[in-house]
Structures are given as C-alpha cells and as structure tokens.
Swiss-Prot record:
Pfam family, one: SIS_2
Binding-site list for Zn(2+): H55, E59, Q166, H174
Pathway terms, separated by semicolons: Carbohydrate biosynthesis; D-glycero-D-manno-heptose 7-phosphate biosynthesis; D-glycero-alpha-D-manno-heptose 7-phosphate and D-glycero-beta-D-manno-heptose 7-phosphate from sedoheptulose 7-phosphate: step 1/1
Protein name: Phosphoheptose isomerase
Subcellular location: Cytoplasm
Names of required cofactors: Zn(2+)
PANTHER family: DNAA INITIATOR-ASSOCIATING PROTEIN DIAA, SEDOHEPTULOSE 7-PHOSPHATE ISOMERASE / DNAA INITIATOR-ASSOCIATING FACTOR FOR REPLICATION INITIATION
Coiled-coil regions listed in the entry: none
Keyword Cell membrane carried by entry: no
Record-linked InterPro entries: GmhA/DiaA (IPR035461), Phosphoheptose_Isoase (IPR004515), SIS_dom (IPR001347), SIS_dom_sf (IPR046348), SIS_GmhA/DiaA_subfam (IPR050099)
Known role: Catalyzes the isomerization of sedoheptulose 7-phosphate in D-glycero-D-manno-heptose 7-phosphate.
Molecular function, one GO term: D-sedoheptulose 7-phosphate isomerase activity
Length: 196
C-alpha cells in the first residue's frame, strides 16, 4: 500500500512541474477574465472526461467554496436527446461541434478534455471553436496528442496511463475552479463566506 501511494505521489510531482504550473496559472487567468467579461465556458469530453466536464460545470454554476453568483458553464455531454438525435441522424464525431455552433459566441471558451489527445469528437469541437473565434483550453495526456495545434491554453501531460491522467486532471481543474472563484469573488469580501 505504501509503495502504491508513493508511486502515485511521484507521478503527480512529475506532472505538476514548473512548466505545467505556469500553464495552469495562465489558464486560470484567462478563464477568470472571460467570465468577468460576460463570456461562457463550454466543456466536452467522453466517458470519464465527460464526467469531468460535468464536474467542472457544476463547480462553476454552483460553487467551489464561496457563496457567490453562478458562472455560465455548460457541459456538452449532458443532454441525451441532443446527443442521440445528432448521432443517429448524422454522426457522433460532430456531436460536440454542433453544440459549439449552437451555443457559442466569440470570446467564449471551449475546454476540450481527452486523456488520449485523439478523441475525434473533441477535436472536431475544437476545430469549430477556432472557426467561431473562441478561446480553447485543451486538457490531455500523451503530450496533447492531436489537440496540440487546436489549443490556445494547453494543459498537457506526458503521462500515457489513463487513470493517472485522470487523477492529474482532477487536481488541475479543482485548482482552476478554486482560483477563478477566488479572483472573481474573494476580493469582494466573500472570503469569509466559505461553504462547508
């Protein structure tokens, strides 16, 4: 058991190196800035990454720690009717891109999550986002895979083992949620209103 814990901690320490932490801080800044400007965040992924997308949206719409107003974040994998209608009539590969086309405005952010970096529907969504003038965050293993050229704010790790990538992702987006919330609301005196 001790070996397993130490191995996981070593993986996390390697992942959160200075370069990755700088990228993380840049991402926090852009998410806070775009929310403050009235833009929204769209998030997409498959499987565990779809669950992560829902988790991120819930933290922003609800709250992470502070009692504050909701922030506009939408997970694109949550509407079964939309997902199945589009996939049945057209193709699953563009199921997120179609929603980006429907919901996004210039200045919004698309956050694509893919542990492999090669999820076709996430890639197509990122392509649509670039066409529409959105900012893009890419969160992936495998050094970014095919998301590299489509990502303005990369959060890529060199890890190839999916469970380890997912653990890194969880810590990463919790940090983003925590710090975006703090930047937007703690200065207004809400730091004393921490939810428990």
């Amino acid at each position: 058991m001790n070996y397993w814990i130490q191995h996981r901690l070593n993986c996390l320490e390697q992942a959160f190196n200075p370069k990755y932490c700088r990228a993380l801080e840049h991402t926090i800044g852009i998410v806070a800035r775009q929310f403050k400007a009235g833009n929204k965040l769209l998030i997409c992924g498959n499987g565990g990454s779809a669950a992560d997308a829902q988790h991120i949206a819930a933290e922003f719409v609800g709250r992470f720690q502070l009692h504050r107003k909701g922030l506009p974040a939408i997970a694109l994998g949550t509407n079964p009717a939309t997902l199945t209608a589009w996939s049945n009539d057209y193709e699953f590969e563009t199921v997120f891109a179609r929603q980006v086309e429907a919901f996004a405005q210039p200045g919004d952010i698309l956050w694509g999550i893919s542990t492999s970096g090669k999820s076709a529907n996430v890639i197509r969504a990122m392509e649509m986002a670039k066409d529409l003038g959105l900012l893009t965050i890419g969160m992936a293993g495998n050094n970014g895979g095919m998301l590299k050229d489509l990502t303005d704010y990369p959060l890529f790790v060199s890890e190839y083992h999916t469970p380890y990538i997912q653990e890194i992702h969880l810590i990463t987006y919790h940090r983003i949620c925590e710090q975006v919330e703090a930047q937007l609301f703690a200065k207004a005196g809400l730091e004393a209103q921490i939810a428990v």
